Amino acid sequence: MEISKVRIQDIPEEERPRERLIRNGPESLSNSELLGVILRTGSNKENVVSLSSRIFSEYSIKQLSLANVSRLMKVHGVGKAKAAQIAAVFELARRLETFVEEPKRKVCSPKDVYTLMYPKMREQKKEKFITLCLDTKNQILKEEVVSIGSLNASIVHPREVFKSALMESSASVIMIHNHPSGDPSPSREDIMVTEKMVEGGKLLGIDVLDHIIIGEGRYVSLKDEGFVR
């Protein structure tokens, strides 16, 4: 039987492009195999492996990247949906070439954190608990909302607080939450949560640099108050 007539599901699983990509990484696939993963299905007359190989026999990768949807649809077996998929992939590749990553924001003091977070938190009607995940230069890797509602030491768990920090390989975190009343004075619960997270961070090798409470036009740093050691 011609390979073009073989259904993709009849090809041994370990030989299918998608499964090989998952197992060995995308660099292990040829151009036509990568295209097959993108297209997913072939036509009524040929499977996706054969279709992708034929496309690359008619076009170089450069020509394919420059072809618009109308031109791609002239390839036998390529309809509007497949043409759009191909065009979208190459457009993403072009955008990657011109992508410039924004410089990471650096925080060096409680005032820096307050200046950054106050505009986002001043009109919140409920308490919002946020962590800033930082690298070794105190540059922000990620800002994560951990919980919304009254801060409670029995509810806020280190697992949620440090989840993003672990995923981002953060060196440290800063915790922030607001007091909708406008008074940033720490409650007993605030202090308990702080102490609990500081201990949790020590176990995980992630420093808790501070816990900052934001009120109306002012803030309190629990590090400055002596509760973060």
From Swiss-Prot:
GO terms for molecular function: metal ion binding; metallopeptidase activity. The keyword Zinc applies. Zn(2+) binds at H177, H179, D190. Residues 106-228 form the MPN domain. Keywords: Hydrolase, Metal-binding, Metalloprotease, Protease, Zinc. A motif (JAMM motif) lies at residues 177-190. GO terms for biological process: proteolysis. InterPro entries: MPN, RadC_JAB, UPF0758, UPF0758_CS, UPF0758_N. Belongs to the UPF0758 family. This is UPF0758 protein Mbar_A2303.
